[in-house]
C-alpha cells in the first residue's frame, strides 16, 4: 500500500490509461464445448485508437464509477466496476478507486470497447494499488469478465483459439484501417442461434492466415441478411476496398497499406456514415503507459 501513499503525497490525483480498440482480421467457428460455449479461431489486431480510462485511488475501499460508460448500464453491471471489484476481491486489498471512462469506441460494434476498458482497469489498478500480480493472473481474472479481455490484458496482437482466450502472439505488418459503425446492435447470443451460421469450419493454422487465405468472418453473411444497415455499409465500402466484419459485428472495416490511402478512401464515402481512420498497433499503448509508471 506504500505506492498509494506515495502517489497521493506526490499530488498525482487522476491518472489516464489507454483502452485500445481491436479488430478481428478473420473469425471462424470450429465447434462447441460441452458447456455450450462455441470454439473459434481468430486474429486480434490492436489499434492505436480507443477509449481512455481515468482512475483515482480511494483509501476507503469503495469502487465508484463516475458518469455512465454506456447509457443505460448500471454501475454494478458496468464491466469497469466489475473488473475493479473482482481485482479487489482476488487480491484481498482494502484499496478502492473512482473510475471515469471517456468513450470513443462504439458500443456493440465488435471493436472490443467494454472488454478493453475492463482490461485497462485490471492492469492499471494492479499498478496503482501496488499489487504486483502477474499478467497471467490478470488474464485469468479477465476471462471471468469476457473472452476478449485477456488479449487486452496481454497487449499483443494474437492468434486466438478456444473461446478466444488461447493466445499466441504474432507479428503483423503495419497497416491502416477505415472503420465504419453501422449503428445497429444484434446481441451475440441471437447470432449464435442463427441457422445460417457456419459452426463447423475446418481448423486452420497461423500459416493459413499468413498466406492471406483467411479473411472471412462467420457472422458476416448472417448480419448482412439480417441488418439492412450492415449491408448498406458493405456496399459502400466495397467501392473503396474489401470490407470485413469485426467480432460479431456490426462494425465493418477495410485494411490499407498506408494511412494516406485510408484517408483517401474515407473521402469517397457518404458523409452520413460514422467512420474513422486508425492505424494498427504493434502492441497495446496500455503497455507503454504501464512502463511509464515504472520508470
From Swiss-Prot:
Pathway: Isoprenoid biosynthesis; isopentenyl diphosphate biosynthesis via DXP pathway; isopentenyl diphosphate from 1-deoxy-D-xylulose 5-phosphate: step 3/6. ATP binds at residues 106-116. It catalyses: 4-CDP-2-C-methyl-D-erythritol + ATP = 4-CDP-2-C-methyl-D-erythritol 2-phosphate + ADP + H(+). The active site is at residues 22, 148. Keywords: ATP-binding, Isoprene biosynthesis, Kinase, Nucleotide-binding, Transferase. InterPro entries: GHMP_kinase_C_dom, GHMP_kinase_C_sf, GHMP_kinase_N_dom, IspE, Ribosomal_Su5_D2-typ_SF, Ribsml_uS5_D2-typ_fold_subgr. Its EC number is 2.7.1.148. One of its GO terms (molecular function) is 4-(cytidine 5'-diphospho)-2-C-methyl-D-erythritol kinase activity. The keyword Nucleotide-binding applies. NCBIfam families: ispE (TIGR00154). Catalyzes the phosphorylation of the position 2 hydroxy group of 4-diphosphocytidyl-2C-methyl-D-erythritol. Belongs to the GHMP kinase family. IspE subfamily. This is 4-diphosphocytidyl-2-C-methyl-D-erythritol kinase. It comes from Xanthomonas euvesicatoria pv. vesicatoria (strain 85-10) (Xanthomonas campestris pv. vesicatoria). The gene is ispE.
